[in-house]
Amino acid sequence: LLKNITEFKELDSAKTTFISTISHELKTPISAIMMSLQLLEDKRVGTLNEEQEQLSKSIKDSSQRLLEITGELLNMTQVEAGKLQMMPKITKPIELIEYAIKANQVQADKFNIQIEVEYPEEKIGKLFVDSEKIAWVLTNLLSNAIRYSRENGRVVIGAQQEGDQIELYVQDFGKGIDPRYHQSIFDRYFRVPGTKVQGSGLGLSISKDFVEAHGGTLTVESELGKGSRFVIRLRA
């Protein structure tokens, strides 16, 4: 039994190393593709016709998704290897919200989704967190909200303070999540049966790991037909 456990740990470690290595190797060529596409968009190599512009946009969207997946895989390997490095600093919640909006604005415009902000600044304190990681979580949650929303709809991102807890939340008004899956959606690689939205099944799992590494919680409130609300709770 001890031998089997040792072999399992070695295999798991090898898997983590392999995924990390492949993800690093993929980032460079994908980034190069993105840079080349940007040159095309800026018309530095000539003007594109309509068909070429559509093709360029399609390649860029796919490349961006690949880049997101490699980022998710790298984050996952850090968590699994116990090498998650935290660099906390004093951060205003609005800075995290603004980062998430900026990162998702193009996607929101694509589907004509209105992003609404709820932020009573005078009533909210500051956080001592790794701003890069919490911003990543909010960005992922907002991206999901947009992708699961109806076209021409709206999503809400905001913050509020309850005692010594600051809540950062993202809400959509899409189809919602079956209560049976409210816990499972935070599992690695889990995908809600029947969903048509593309994804790796890693984003929410990594988000939960990042939040819990700060001593916080990430939860979901959802009702079928009415949408979903994801809430990050952190100590102020």
Language model segments and positions:
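Conserved catalytic submotifs in the C-terminal HATPase_c
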Residues: 53, 87-92, 109, 114-125
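Short alpha-helical segment of the dimerization/phosphotransfer core of two-component systems
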Residues: 61-68
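Short alpha-helical Gxxx[C/S/T] motif in the catalytic ATP-binding
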Residues: 203, 207
